[in-house]
Amino acid sequence: MNTYKNSLNHFLNLVDCLEKIPNVGKKSAFKMAYHLGLENPYLALKITHALENALENLKRCASCNALSESEICEICSDESRQNSQLCMVLHPRDVFILEDLKDFLGRYYVLNSIEEVDFNALEKRLIEENIKEIIFAFPPTLANDSLMLYIEDKLQHFHLTFTKIAQGVPTGVNFENIDSVSLSRAFNSRIKA
């Protein structure tokens, strides 16, 4: 007897797709689908166009793995940035968050996963850019502490200074859930790893 819902396949498919977005529940997905499908179809078309453009143009920077629309991102190609510091982060979105603080003027390296790290390319970059310090900007967890130790061990022959952001960042919390003042203080109070 559920024929009404069965007759709305396209709408329910949209709800289902929106619900797959992280942090979007069924109710929020339903509200978005209703808004886009009925109340503001122009916005839906605009979003569709923006998604097509993003999918067509977004890529990973060949140097740091951050998001870019060219082979090398704006940060890596900016000659005014400090070459002596390399900030390692876990996700491309972390670069956005740290850049918004305007506290760091060095370079970045995004670790998508430890399995994907090309240590040969990273070592070449350390030499070419004359990196002296690696800053680990990871949320504090035991797994991330192990990751820092592993990276330090792999790169110890470079005699780098290894630091990590201070423990003002709550354990188990992602950067997007931390206010900018706390994150800025933690970043500026980083300690030797």
From Swiss-Prot:
Residues 84-170 form the Toprim domain. Signal peptide: none annotated. Keywords: DNA damage, DNA recombination, DNA repair, Metal-binding, Zinc, Zinc-finger. It comes from the Bacteria. The keyword Metal-binding applies. This is Recombination protein RecR. Belongs to the RecR family. The gene is recR. CDD domains: TOPRIM_recR (cd01025). GO terms for molecular function: DNA binding; zinc ion binding. InterPro entries: DNA_Rcmb_RecR, Rcmb_RecR, Rcmb_RecR_Znf, TOPRIM_dom, TOPRIM_RecR. NCBIfam families: recR. One of its GO terms (biological process) is DNA recombination. May play a role in DNA repair. It seems to be involved in an RecBC-independent recombinational process of DNA repair. It may act with RecF and RecO. Pfam families: RecR_HhH (PF21176), RecR_ZnF (PF02132). PANTHER family: RECOMBINATION PROTEIN RECR (PTHR30446:SF0).
